[in-house]
Amino acid sequence: MGKIIDGKKIASEIRNELKEEVKKFTEEGRPPGLSVVLVGDDPASRTYVRMKEKVAKEIGIYSKVDYLSRQTTQDELLDIVDKLNNDEKIDGILVQLPLPDHIDEKAVIEAISPFKDVDGFHPINTGKLFSGMTGQRFEACTPLGIIELLDREGIEIDGKKAVVVGRSNIVGKPVAHLLLERHATVTVCHSHTADLGIETRQADILVVAAGRPKLVKGEMVKEGAAVIDVGTNRVDGHLVGDVDFEAARQRAGYITPVPGGVGPMTIAMLMKNTVKARKYHGV
C-alpha cells in the first residue's frame, strides 16, 4: 500500500518558508509584487485567480488583479502587459489562460518580460530549460511542483527510470526536461505510444498528465513506484485523476491524490517564482 503524498501539507510548508523571505524584502523596502490579469468571466479561471490572490496575501506578496471584460481586444491586453513590464512594483506577471478565441495566446505570452514570466511559459524561459541553461530562468509551476514533491518526500531521481505520460508544453515536456536535468532516464509517452502499459511498468517515477480519467490502471504501475497524478477530470460530479488511485496505490510506493496532490503545489510554486523574480530585480 503506497504512501499518500500530501500536497496540501507540503505546499503549506513552502508558503511558511516564503513568508520569512517576503518579510525580509518588505523590511528592506518593498514586498515582491504579483500581477494577475483575467480576461472574461470563465468561472474556473475566476476561482483560480481568487485562490492565487488569497495565497499571495497570506504570504505577504503585493497582489494586483486586473479583471477585464471578454470584449477586451488583443491590443488593449498587450498594452496592459507592457505597462506591467515597466511597473517597478511588479516582479511577476501572470495572464490567466485560456484567453478568448480572438486573442492570440502566444503573442501575449511572448509580450511578457521573460524576467517577470513567473508562469514559466515565455519562449526564452522554455528555451533555457530545454537547452539546459541554468541561471536566471523560470520553470513552469506544475512541473516545478512535481520535482519539489519528489524532493521533499526523499524520492531519489538520479539514475532512476522516469516515465511521463503526456507531452503538453505546460506539464509533459517541461517536467521531462527537469527530470533529465536531475539525471533520470526519461521516456515520454503520448497518444501514439504503441503499448502504454509496457512503458509505465518500467517506471520508478511515473508522472501522468494526459487529461484522461483513470487512464493508468493498477496493473500498469511498477511495484514500489512513485506515482504523480497531474490529471483533474470531473466525472459524475467528482474530481478524479488520470490514475486509478485505489488500484494503483496497491502497487505504488508513493502516490499523489486528486485533489490534494499536485494542485496545491502549482500555486505554491507560482509564489516561489514571484519571490525569485523579486531577487532578480533587487530593488
Curated annotation (Swiss-Prot):
Gene3D superfamilies: Leucine Dehydrogenase, chain A, domain 1, NAD(P)-binding Rossmann-like Domain. SUPFAM superfamilies: Aminoacid dehydrogenase-like, N-terminal domain, NAD(P)-binding Rossmann-fold domains. One of its GO terms (biological process) is methionine biosynthetic process. Its EC number is 1.5.1.5, 3.5.4.9. InterPro entries: Aminoacid_DH-like_N_sf, NAD(P)-bd_dom_sf, THF_DH/CycHdrlase, THF_DH/CycHdrlase_cat_dom, THF_DH/CycHdrlase_CS, THF_DH/CycHdrlase_NAD-bd_dom. Keywords: Amino-acid biosynthesis, Histidine biosynthesis, Hydrolase, Methionine biosynthesis, Multifunctional enzyme, NADP, One-carbon metabolism, Oxidoreductase, Purine biosynthesis. This is Bifunctional protein FolD. GO terms for molecular function: methenyltetrahydrofolate cyclohydrolase activity; methylenetetrahydrofolate dehydrogenase (NADP+) activity. Homodimer. GO terms for cellular component: cytosol. NCBIfam families: PRK10792.1, PRK14186.1. Transmembrane segments: none annotated. NADP(+) binds at G166, R167, S168, S191, T232. PROSITE patterns: THF_DHG_CYH_1, THF_DHG_CYH_2. It comes from the Bacteria. Catalyzes the oxidation of 5,10-methylenetetrahydrofolate to 5,10-methenyltetrahydrofolate and then the hydrolysis of 5,10-methenyltetrahydrofolate to 10-formyltetrahydrofolate. Pfam families: THF_DHG_CYH, THF_DHG_CYH_C. Pathway: One-carbon metabolism; tetrahydrofolate interconversion. Belongs to the tetrahydrofolate dehydrogenase/cyclohydrolase family. It catalyses: (6R)-5,10-methylene-5,6,7,8-tetrahydrofolate + NADP(+) = (6R)-5,10-methenyltetrahydrofolate + NADPH; (6R)-5,10-methenyltetrahydrofolate + H2O = (6R)-10-formyltetrahydrofolate + H(+).
